[in-house]
């Protein structure tokens, strides 16, 4: 009779929506149980109602906090089938252990912790390892030599003095961007390989580095080692952090930082030049470039020393040709200028004006030509007007030599020796009147 009732209860199933219940409060979403059996529900598959074979349920103690859970795709809707025999109250539903939840509906750990990678092979934590879950950031501090690969942890950065920068420990950030980075950083650089190069923890003395000397890291104080190059192997080059945007801010992981003084801040570019090995040709070119300003400055100093009042040359050079006449202070640069000047002091005036009645003589021909232009070529003056010397006149002819009419026009065919008819002897002053 009981088996017959159990078959009837197996056939009568009711679908109940569980929207208001959370994943911890809702019983198994793809399982059905019989209230006629033991208090512990026996899960059976919906697709095989009569079958008593059920998958093994994992114990609640098997799930460890912090372990990723397996995600399975399932098309089962968020509905549960319950038998109506023992569901008169909500006690059976609320007292249902959470361990009966199917693995298909358990939320994967990456959905709760987006910081973890999808590659779960790197995140399996041994059970015998001590776990520190007191802090909300759930850091897992394990010794680095136990793992070959490092998983990214965005929530915690170890505060240890022997750690290298993230660019050296993270393979994703150690890809060569410039050609210089490939020579200094090997492709197989990892934290496990670099820990052997670091000196012992006892030899590390914390030192404070100002922002002017080293590029600031995202978090944590920077404590570079104070040991010398002898702590490192001879065939291993010293690793240096280098950023193209701030070339003068570089720090060596194997050399002491030294004291921070204003002089050291002023000489930041010199430290940058010492980080790279300079070729002999480039070093010689740099030395010559630094020497050239000193040579220029020495030349400028010599010129400034020569610019004293005693060493200044005379602005007007002392002329060589002087007039020898007493009382004359004439000075000339050329010999011909002096000869022309000497004619003015002599009594000889060979250049005489040809205008009738003028007879003015000059010692130089240029003075006579100036006399023609200024005296006889203009009307209304005291001197006689000559039309042949006026450039604006129709009778302009500077080479004409002969007799002139009373108004100054030329008489062609006449000569200077000839006398004017019916004119008598008239003076120049009479012509002017």
From Swiss-Prot:
SUPFAM superfamilies linked to this entry: beta-beta-alpha zinc fingers
Chain positions covered by the region annotation Disordered: 23-64, 240-265, 391-416
Biased segments, Low complexity type: 30-48
Zinc finger (C2H2-type): 321-345, 351-376
Keyword set, alphabetical order: Activator, Conidiation, DNA-binding, Metal-binding, Nucleus, Repeat, Sporulation, Transcription, Transcription regulation, Zinc, Zinc-finger
Main location: nucleus
A Gene Ontology term for the protein's cellular component: chromatin
Biased composition (Polar residues): 240-264
Induction context: Expression is regulated by the heterotrimeric G protein pga1. Expression is also positively regulated by stuA.
Cellular compartment(s): Nucleus
GO molecular function: DNA-binding transcription factor activity, RNA polymerase II-specific; RNA polymerase II cis-regulatory region sequence-specific DNA binding; zinc ion binding
Annotated InterPro entries: Znf_C2H2_sf, Znf_C2H2_type
Job of this protein: BrlA, abaA and wetA are pivotal regulators of conidiophore development and conidium maturation. They act individually and together to regulate their own expression and that of numerous other sporulation-specific genes. Binds promoters of target genes at brlA response elements (BREs) containing the conserved sequence 5'-(C/A)(A/G)AGGG(G/A)-3'. Is not required for penicillin V production.
Name of protein: C2H2 type master regulator of conidiophore development brlA
Organism this protein belongs to: Penicillium rubens (strain ATCC 28089 / DSM 1075 / NRRL 1951 / Wisconsin 54-1255)
